[in-house]
Amino acid sequence: MQALVVLAPERFEIQEVPVPAPGPMEVLCRVKAVSICGTDSHLIAGDYPGFWPPEFPIIPGHEWSGEIVELGPGAEKAGWKVGDRVAGTSHDACGVCQQCIEGR
C-alpha cells in the first residue's frame, strides 16, 4: 500500500509499505479518505523535538474513514464485519499543545 512517510522534520515521501495484518480483536481497514490536520503539520515540521514523535519515520494522518476488509481473531464478537464503513481518530493526547494544557 502507499503511504506518506515522514523521514525527518520537513522530509517526506510517498512509499510502498507493507499492509498490516489484523491482530486479535483488531480489524484491517481500507482507508478511503484521510486528512492531514494541524497536529500533523506540526509533526511534519518537527515542532515537538524530543517529545513527539519519539522517533522517525512516521506515517501521519490520524483522522480517516474507510471500510473493514479483514477481521482479526475474535473481532466478529465485537460486532464488526467485512464491508462495515468506519471512521476513526487514532492518536493520543500530546500533553503539550494548548488544547491538552486546557484539558480539551
Predicted regions and their residues:
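Short structural boundary motif marking the start of a folded domain
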Residues: 1-4
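Short beta-strand/turn micro-motifs composed of small residues
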Residues: 7
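Short N-terminal binding/cap micro-motifs at the start of the first secondary-structure element
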Residues: 10-14, 38-39
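Glycine-rich beta-strand-centered segment in the early N-terminal region that forms part
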Residues: 18-34, 48-101
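Cytochrome P450 core scaffold surrounding the K-helix E-X-X-R motif
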Residues: 39-45
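Secreted/processed peptides and extracellular or luminal domains of membrane proteins
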Residues: 43, 100-103
